[in-house]
UniProtKB/Swiss-Prot annotation:
It is found in: Cell inner membrane. The chain crosses the membrane at residues 9-29. The keyword Cell inner membrane applies. It comes from Pseudomonas putida (strain ATCC 47054 / DSM 6125 / CFBP 8728 / NCIMB 11950 / KT2440). Keywords: Cell inner membrane, Cell membrane, Cytochrome c-type biogenesis, Heme, Iron, Membrane, Metal-binding, Signal-anchor, Transmembrane, Transmembrane helix. This is Cytochrome c-type biogenesis protein CcmE. The lineage of its organism: Bacteria, Pseudomonadati, Pseudomonadota, Gammaproteobacteria, Pseudomonadales.
Amino acid sequence: MNPQRKKRLLLIVGLLVGVGVAVGFALSALQQNINLFYTPTQIANGEAPLDTRIRAGGMVEKGSVQRSADSLDVRFVVTDFNKSVPITYRGILPDLFREGQGIVALGKLNADGVVVADEVLAKHDEKYMPPEVTKALKESGQAAAGGETKP
């Protein structure tokens, strides 16, 4: 093999290794930022991973919101009308958060089956509902409060 061909081969191999490492880092970073959506039924059935950031969504059960008197801690229950999951959150809830409305909570599921949320998203208006929540409610055979939903 002549020296010029050997040099080219080493350059190509070096570039391929560099691209491979870059793709590996990119995939690793993307995997850490993925938040999969789980319904209350999936969470109650043990399909959601523990201590991994997930999105849990459904309708806030009426009468389930409990606010702490001396802190910003809130505990409420989310349902897809098949099963329910308790969620705890520390912070100020969105203005549109209320019982009987659709929400999506981002957080981690603990060993007690409680989603410890660090972010709560409420629906935008009376007709809008997050697509994941709409799909989960349709699969459970229930309609959202207030009639039809628009994804």
